[in-house]
Structures are given as structure tokens and as C-alpha cells.
């Protein structure tokens, strides 16, 4: 007689946010992140107000729903191989939809890395001051330009996942 072991959850399973509160909180976090990046990044635009701000928030919510919510009965766990695939999808749609007047690449990259860290799957890439040697810069540029496939970009995140065993980790 053969015993069947229960299937364990994938250690890097996609996040599922099917409640409205979580999705709204995540969208607000993106908006706050974008605002902060614009202030510290010496950008030429300021935060959107009025109708433009509402439009941006709605577009962010749409991208996040596509990445993190069940759609037509299909869970993110059914659509994405793992969380790395999921955040690459999210970053691709956020940056290519050009939601904000400025800072789309920065916001998309930093938020994707933040989601990975929140999910205890932090990624560390080379952060060289030279853009051509900076893996973060190359990753987002390749995402925007289509130089590499989304699967290749997700694989790079997967390869650079780091495990920290103490609570005082730098990530």
C-alpha cells in the first residue's frame, strides 16, 4: 500500500488578495511610495490632484487586481508560477501602462521588491553606481524595452532570492 503525502504549499506561492480592504491598502501604499520617490528623486512633476489622482489610483488598483486577485474564478496561484512571476507581471503592467507622469520605472521596481520582501522572499541584486552594471537598472530597463521575456526576468529574481536567518537582516 502506498501512502500519499499531502501536497505542501509552494514556498514561493503567489499572494492572493481577494478582499477589497487589502487591495485598497496595497494601492494606497503604491501611491505613497510614488509620492515619496518623487520627493527624494528630484523629479519635475509633483503629486497628481483631483481627477488625475483618482485616475492614477484606479489604474494602480486595476494592475494590482490583475496580479493579486481571483479573476473569473482563476486564482493568482493558477495564473503565476510563483511570487517572482507574479511581481514581474505586476511591474510590467504598472510600468508599461505608464500610470504616472514620471517615476513609473522607479515606482514599479521598488514596489515589486517591497512585495517580495513583505512575502519573506527578498531579492538582492548588484546596485552599482554605473547604470550598465546596476542589475536593478538593467532589470527594469529590460522589462520596459522587452529585451528579455517576463519569464527570464522572473527567473533573475528567483536566482537572487536571499535567505536571512536572523531578525536583524539588512533586507
Model-derived features: where do they sit?
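FIC/Doc superfamily catalytic core
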Residues: 1-171
Amino acid at each position: 500500500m502506498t501512502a500519499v503525502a499531502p501536497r505542501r504549499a509552494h514556498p514561493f506561492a503567489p499572494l492572493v488578495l481577494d478582499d477589497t480592504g487589502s487591495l485598497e491598502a496595497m494601492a494606497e501604499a503604491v501611491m505613497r511610495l510614488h509620492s515619496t520617490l518623487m520627493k527624494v528623486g528630484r523629479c519635475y512633476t509633483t503629486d497628481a490632484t483631483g481627477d488625475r489622482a483618482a485616475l492614477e489610483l484606479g489604474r494602480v488598483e486595476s494592475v494590482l487586481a490583475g496580479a493579486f486577485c481571483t479573476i473569473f474564478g482563476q486564482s493568482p496561484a493558477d495564473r503565476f508560477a510563483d511570487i517572482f512571476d507574479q511581481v514581474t507581471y505586476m511591474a510590467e503592467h504598472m510600468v508599461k501602462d505608464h500610470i504616472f507622469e514620471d517615476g513609473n520605472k522607479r515606482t514599479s521596481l521598488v514596489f515589486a521588491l517591497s512585495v517580495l520582501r513583505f512575502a519573506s522572499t527578498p531579492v538582492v541584486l548588484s546596485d552599482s553606481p554605473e547604470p550598465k552594471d546596476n542589475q536593478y537598472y538593467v532589470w527594469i530597463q529590460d522589462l520596459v524595452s522587452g529585451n528579455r521575456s517576463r519569464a527570464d526576468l522572473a527567473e533573475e529574481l528567483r536566482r537572487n532570492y536571499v535567505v536571512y536567518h536572523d531578525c536583524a537582516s539588512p533586507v
